[in-house]
Protein backbone atom coordinates (compact mmCIF):
# COMPACT_ATOMS: atom_id res chain seq x y z
CA UNK A 1 0.00 0.00 0.00
CA UNK A 2 1.02 3.56 -0.59
CA UNK A 3 0.42 6.49 1.72
CA UNK A 4 0.81 10.19 1.12
CA UNK A 5 2.15 12.20 4.08
CA UNK A 6 3.34 15.75 4.37
CA UNK A 7 7.11 15.95 4.49
CA UNK A 8 6.90 17.35 8.03
CA UNK A 9 4.72 14.44 9.22
CA UNK A 10 6.98 11.88 7.57
CA UNK A 11 10.14 13.30 9.16
CA UNK A 12 8.40 13.62 12.54
CA UNK A 13 7.28 9.99 12.35
CA UNK A 14 10.77 8.74 11.53
CA UNK A 15 12.37 10.84 14.28
CA UNK A 16 9.86 9.75 16.94
CA UNK A 17 9.64 6.01 16.37
CA UNK A 18 11.66 2.84 16.60
CA UNK A 19 13.99 1.66 13.83
CA UNK A 20 11.53 -1.14 13.02
CA UNK A 21 9.09 1.44 11.68
CA UNK A 22 11.51 2.73 9.05
CA UNK A 23 12.30 -0.90 8.18
CA UNK A 24 8.63 -1.48 7.24
CA UNK A 25 8.80 1.25 4.59
CA UNK A 26 9.76 -0.30 1.26
CA UNK A 27 10.11 2.87 -0.76
CA UNK A 28 9.71 6.63 -0.48
CA UNK A 29 9.44 9.31 -3.11
CA UNK A 30 8.97 13.05 -2.88
CA UNK A 31 6.00 14.38 -4.80
CA UNK A 32 5.78 17.64 -6.73
CA UNK A 33 3.68 19.17 -3.94
CA UNK A 34 6.41 18.40 -1.40
CA UNK A 35 4.59 15.47 0.18
CA UNK A 36 6.24 12.10 0.68
CA UNK A 37 4.72 8.96 -0.83
CA UNK A 38 5.64 5.90 1.22
CA UNK A 39 5.13 2.28 0.21
CA UNK A 40 4.68 -0.50 2.74
CA UNK A 41 4.00 -4.21 2.43
CA UNK A 42 1.86 -4.46 5.57
CA UNK A 43 -0.17 -1.40 6.53
CA UNK A 44 -1.41 -3.10 9.70
CA UNK A 45 2.15 -3.58 10.89
CA UNK A 46 2.93 0.08 10.19
CA UNK A 47 -0.10 1.19 12.20
CA UNK A 48 0.89 -1.12 15.06
CA UNK A 49 4.38 0.34 15.16
CA UNK A 50 2.97 3.87 15.24
CA UNK A 51 0.77 2.83 18.17
CA UNK A 52 3.87 1.51 19.91
CA UNK A 53 5.62 4.83 19.29
CA UNK A 54 2.69 6.69 20.87
CA UNK A 55 2.99 4.51 23.97
CA UNK A 56 6.80 4.72 24.15
CA UNK A 57 7.38 8.37 23.26
CA UNK A 58 4.06 10.15 23.31
CA UNK A 59 2.70 9.71 26.81
CA UNK A 60 3.51 11.25 30.15
CA UNK A 61 3.82 9.39 33.46
CA UNK A 62 0.03 9.31 33.81
CA UNK A 63 -0.44 7.91 30.27
CA UNK A 64 -1.91 11.13 28.93
CA UNK A 65 -0.79 12.00 25.40
CA UNK A 66 1.93 14.63 25.12
CA UNK A 67 2.35 16.91 22.10
CA UNK A 68 4.46 14.17 20.49
CA UNK A 69 1.71 11.64 21.17
CA UNK A 70 -0.97 13.90 19.73
CA UNK A 71 1.03 14.41 16.55
CA UNK A 72 1.68 10.66 16.24
CA UNK A 73 -2.06 10.03 16.72
CA UNK A 74 -2.75 12.52 13.92
CA UNK A 75 -0.35 10.67 11.59
CA UNK A 76 -1.88 7.33 12.63
CA UNK A 77 -5.36 8.64 11.81
CA UNK A 78 -4.21 9.93 8.42
CA UNK A 79 -2.65 6.60 7.46
CA UNK A 80 -5.69 4.65 8.72
CA UNK A 81 -8.00 6.91 6.71
CA UNK A 82 -5.96 6.41 3.53
CA UNK A 83 -5.83 2.64 4.15
CA UNK A 84 -9.62 2.46 4.49
CA UNK A 85 -10.08 4.58 1.35
CA UNK A 86 -7.79 2.28 -0.64
CA UNK A 87 -9.53 -0.86 0.63
CA UNK A 88 -12.94 0.60 -0.20
CA UNK A 89 -11.75 1.51 -3.70
CA UNK A 90 -10.37 -2.02 -4.23
CA UNK A 91 -13.63 -3.52 -2.98
CA UNK A 92 -15.64 -1.37 -5.39
CA UNK A 93 -13.34 -2.29 -8.29
CA UNK A 94 -13.70 -6.00 -7.49
CA UNK A 95 -17.50 -5.79 -7.47
CA UNK A 96 -17.67 -4.19 -10.92
What feature does the model see in each segment?
Residues 2-41:
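N-terminal acidic leader/helix
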Residues 32-80:
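Acidic, low-complexity, intrinsically disordered interaction modules
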Residues 20-22, 30, 55, 67, ...:
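General N-terminal targeting signals
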Residues 86-96:
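Short acidic DE-rich linear segments
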Residues 10, 76-83, 87:
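Long amphipathic alpha-helical segments
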Amino acid sequence: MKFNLSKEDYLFLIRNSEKELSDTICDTSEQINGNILISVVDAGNLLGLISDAVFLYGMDDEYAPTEIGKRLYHIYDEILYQKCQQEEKEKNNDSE
